[in-house]
Amino acid sequence: NKNDSTNNYVTFTTKFGSIYNEFVPLEEFKMKKVPHGVAHFLEHKVFVQKEGLQPEEFFSKSGALCNAYTTFKNTTYLFSGPNNLKENILYLLDYVQEPYFTEENVESEKGIITQEIHMCDDNPTDVLYEYIRKNSFYNNPFKDSIIGTTNDINKITKDILYECYNTFY
């Protein structure tokens, strides 16, 4: 129907947010600590596919928009659009469940996320929010930034990403 204005909104959420930087990895028995910002970094890297269309290209060609976001407790991948619901859902499931991390693409992402951190540091509202949060949650995992610090980001490797992915996804 030409007058149908239905817009589909589909999400894929995993319970891996920024507060989960200490955990027992899958098939291991000892607690491990990873740098802050890993969940957000992983969110960025899941958008990179080994071959074929990248998510932004695929969804754009089908008339949909895609995005992702990380919170303290979750990471969500999503798309919205009026057409091709089945194909879009299948693609969302495929790209989120087929990670592709290399030392090269992890290193290049560090620069992108570092720029994101600097943008937040240049925004007075973000700076105030970070200050209030750090002081309000002094002894709580919510005190740490979702995106991490530049020091945290520089410690992230493809092995850390795969370990977190395999544990939480």
Q: Where do the model's predicted regions map?
A:
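His/Glu-rich zincin catalytic helix
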Residues: 1-54, 165-169
